[in-house]
Amino acid sequence: MDCFIHIGPSKTGSSSIQAFLTENEQELYKNGICFLRLSKANFFELRFAFSCEYKNTRASQNLGITSENYEEKKNLFKKRIARKISKVKDQGLTRVIISAEGLGALNKTEIQSISKWMYKRFEQISIIPVLRRQDRRALSRYKNIVKNKGHLEQQCLVATDNFDLEYFLKLWMDIFGKKNIKPILFPDSVPESRDLIKDFCAASELSHLSNILKIDGFRRNESIDGRAIEIMRQINLMKPDRHLVPMDKTQRRLNGIIENSFDFPLEKVQPSKKEAMDFYETY
């Protein structure tokens, strides 16, 4: 049985890919393909099952992971994933597709661990990363943390992780082999017109099913007008400690109203020249 693993990283259209897989899950199953996950489509359990240290994040909180039960949860996730894979094999399916953007944050030791574990269960494994221009990815992150995490600074190019694409790809190539890495390009990062879902289908060898799968209409997290983002940021300034607690329903509704007040994103979020120069010096 073969496995295709989409690894993100974040802010590269993962929710769109997962929406496509979820919508077409039954049709894929009829064709011998399993969209594998435990609960939600983002499959964060897989990332935590092979992480080396506990980190308190929104994802870990949603899965009930604490510093006290961390090792117990890791083992539980591995057992549940292993059982699910065994069940898929027993059903006679020939291929598994996984979309887990959290895997994009794994370090070398963690990638080696998941590789060893996966190759005990699959004959062939292909890794699908999505590559996006660093400035576009940083702008997307800025809009996300203003809207959802109470970000205060008017700093458009947010690159807190100093993400290095070459290092990222080399990690996975060194462990899974260069021929098994099938990168695709995010549409806003290349001059030619591209379709993320069609490119994902090509990388995961689903193109032959394009006549029976629903391909269009899966773009999620549409671009938000820059004016809406700035209004949200200024509201955040009224409560500068909001990032310390989860966003409540009232704030979510307010941000939704602000976002919907601009029918089409005419104003883009753009960094200053100095901010752009400082950003590019890190790459």
Regions found by a protein language model. Name each.
Residues 1-283:
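Anion-recognition interface
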